[in-house]
Amino acid sequence: MPGSGTSTFIDPDDYQASLDRVPLDLLLVTSRGEFKASVTSARLNHLYLLRSEEDFPRVAYISLSPALVFVGFPGRSSPPIVWGGVELHPGEIVLHSSAERFHQRTAGPCSWGLIGLASAQFERYSKTLTGKALTAPAAGRVLWPAARNSARLLRLFTQACRLAQTRPKILGHPEVARGLEQGIIHALMTCLRSTRVKCNGPATQDRQQILMRFEDVLADRLGGLLRMSELCALTGVNERTLRSCCAEFLGISPSRYVLLRRLKQAHTALRDGDRATVSVGEIARACGFTELGRFARAYQTVFGETPLTTLRRPPGSGPTSPIFTDPA
């Protein structure tokens, strides 16, 4: 059943949780200040549309649903967005692989969009409109369609999102939803049919796989002692390579990324914890911190308050200071 909606967020965790079809396994905001983002989504018959507008630089680790074929792109006037280590400029699009995992990094206020189409429908429409049944590629591709084709796709996408934001009920009418959907699908297939592939090169794909192994190691070992030498060994690369990949994809060093992931994990546990049954020390140790004084100082630097203050605060209240990083 067609549906749509728009929401505004001042808390990074709430924003992260709202992207149900685009699971953000991790969202680290990389600037001080009051976080603000808005999300507009439209669910038509076979299409899922999402437009996000964000005020602050951040890095996200994203896992796409295998049920849909996704195409992503920056907004018309958005600064470059780094998708999987590659700068994406207005007019370019990403055709994602099935269930793709990747990092997305922004350097400032930006907007970006995502179109999801059920795999079977993607194959059927592509065969009808291009003469060739297309499927999600084995690896994500950055494409460079003709300017008029990408402009048409963005215009129709923006039109649908504007209706979802200002007149959401109208998208509940089957004829309106069907007309918008057909126009967007046709524009999308035109972009995919007549396009140039932006050369990423196998080296970029290899480096992306290094980052995925890095994330797998962190998912398994984040709560334990993890020295740089061990992290490199488990990832299967030397320290120089890991540092280079993290700088390219994440914009920060591996050690800084690990610290911020642990602090975010601790922040979530403290925010949701019951102070009658859990202590700051227990949470800190569970998140891999062995020196409580150093943990408390790092936590306060990032979140603007002590860990105990977060634990004592009633759920849903208090400041929403985002995580920030320095270039270390």
What is the predicted function of each stretch?
Residues L242, C246, R294-F295, Y299:
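Short hydrophobic/aromatic patch on the recognition helix
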Residues L64, R207, L259:
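Short, conserved glycine- and acidic-residue-centered signature motifs
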Residues A42, I81, F295:
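Short aromatic-centered micro-motifs
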